[in-house]
A protein has these predicted regions:
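Positively charged, phosphate-engaging catalytic surfaces used for nucleic-acid and nucleotide handling
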Residues: 1-97
Length: 97
């Protein structure tokens, strides 16, 4: 695999996570927000970034298990919804000081 091929695969997997978390690819976000610098993750909340980090690990496991990309996207979206619900509820409890 060439470096260019590896970069394309990495970008595609990053967009799987972006769609699961934010409902859009990085390109779609940039087109919707041309006035903003950076990328979608630069504007994510702490909880969204925590969720994304968890989803990256889960996605790696799903890839190792041979789960097709479409199925991974559905599962990761469900995981994102559940994790964000938990993280947002934890914020309200002030568990970390």
């Amino acid at each position: 695999m060439t470096q260019a091929q590896a970069s394309i695969i990495y970008a595609e997997e990053a967009d799987v996570l972006n769609v699961a978390m934010f409902g859009q690819t990085a390109k779609q976000w940039r087109e919707a927000h041309p006035e903003l610098k950076g990328n979608i993750r630069d504007y994510a909340s702490i909880n969204e970034l925590i969720c994304l980090a968890n989803m990256e690990n889960i996605n790696a496991v799903l890839i190792d298990e041979g789960v097709p990309q479409g199925d991974r996207l559905v599962r990761l979206n469900q995981i994102a919804i559940n994790q964000m619900r938990v993280l947002e509820n934890d914020d309200n409890r002030n568990l970390l000081k």
